[in-house]
Amino acid sequence: MRTLLLCFFIAAATNGQAHEVDNIDYDLYTDGTAWVADGKKAQGDVTIPSKIEVDGKEYTVVGINSNAFSANESITSVTLPDNLKYINDEAFSYCYNLENINNIPKHIENLGENGRIFYRTKFLDNGIKNEFFVFSDWLIKYTPQGETAKVTVPEGIFGISAYALTDADNTVVLPKSLRAASVLAFNSDLKYIDTGDNPVYAYKDGILFCEGTVTFYKNERELKDEVSVDGMWADVIFNNAVKNGVLLIPGKVETAGNVVKQVGGVRKGKLPGLTCEKLIVDEGVKYITDHAFRFFEPLQYVDLPSTLMNIGSWAFVDAKIESLVCRMPQPMNVPYYFVSYIKKFNSKVYVPKALLDTYKTTETYWNLIPAENFYQIEGNVPESGILASVKPIESVGKATVKAIYTLNGTKVNSLQHGINIVKMSDGTVRKVINKGYKNR
């Protein structure tokens, strides 16, 4: 199965050298490719060649960089090269007189992240008069032609650009052909996504998941720490994913053909203004990448699973976390900026009892947190965080359920509706609120 790097900004290699051809500057690379870097001197009908020759060497034009033609009011049409694969953010934004794009490739790998490739152009103004404005194999914008409860994205669409479906707030049906969708593509109040027979997308409880490859830095921001991970990623989180102030990232999700797949992590993305105080990441999830919950200030309680292996430096930047529960079996090597924000807000950190002293004395960045801010998990998780236990209690850490009691001390065989007292095999005791989960 083909997987796709779900990152909506493609940056060319860093060995680029600039060279001008016919009033267009190109960045040249040692792999024989060229990117349009600056076309602000171009005028009228512009043709971007498929290949350019510099000092006897031929380069294939594969991309147009961010803002390359931005605010050029002199161009009226652009003919694209046959080998074009990437167009980055705002490449043609504010080109007010740009009306025609010719020789559009049948397939584009990436159309930027912010959805403003053709912002404030005649080309876009004309395109959005149609119900579905499609550029190459990307949906640029859906425009309602009347009231509809369900929007079906046409088959053959490879990618959905940012803001393409913001006018759809009920149900969206994704095509089998879809392999890429911006985290900003949808209305945050969208009620449901039908992924149908799509083999790489899945939707569960207000979260859109996508199977693919994500490249990120492991713990620190050095190239030697860069890793690429294949898996199923929590990609877009909608408002209805939050239940009673709690956002649960599940450990498993069902895809087409009733295939259950493990959720590998939460991808770099932007939350659509959720009102959420508590985040629970279920067992099985291994990665929380950079910016996954950045600027999410209402977040006060975070519960991390024992399976977690990596947190991005900026994963929780500016989230005013009061209580952080770390169920990992040993102090994870975390990045400096993650710990610095935990320290900044004087957060309480709850860890397994056996690791309490280890966290206080570790040589990792955890030692930046005052020793008095560490607490053992059993019996000390704050009341404000008890709702974290809405996830199946059998999946919390490696301990198993030994006995379940009601509040009045009566022993029962399974979780009852409401508050339960649960004794675990490791000797810990937990309060668990059951809102419908059945004992597995």
What are these language model-derived features?
Residues 16-20:
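Boundary at the C-terminal end of the N-terminal hydrophobic targeting segment
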Residues 66-68, 88-91, 115-117, 163-164, ...:
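Consensus positions within tandem repeat domains that build extended binding/scaffold surfaces
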Residues 23-32, 41-63, 72-86, 95-112, ...:
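Structural signature of tandem-repeat unit edges
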Residues 386-440:
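C-terminal outer-membrane/trafficking sorting elements
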Residues 3-12:
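Sec-dependent N-terminal signal peptides
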Residues 316, 337-342, 363:
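A structural signal for leucine-rich repeat
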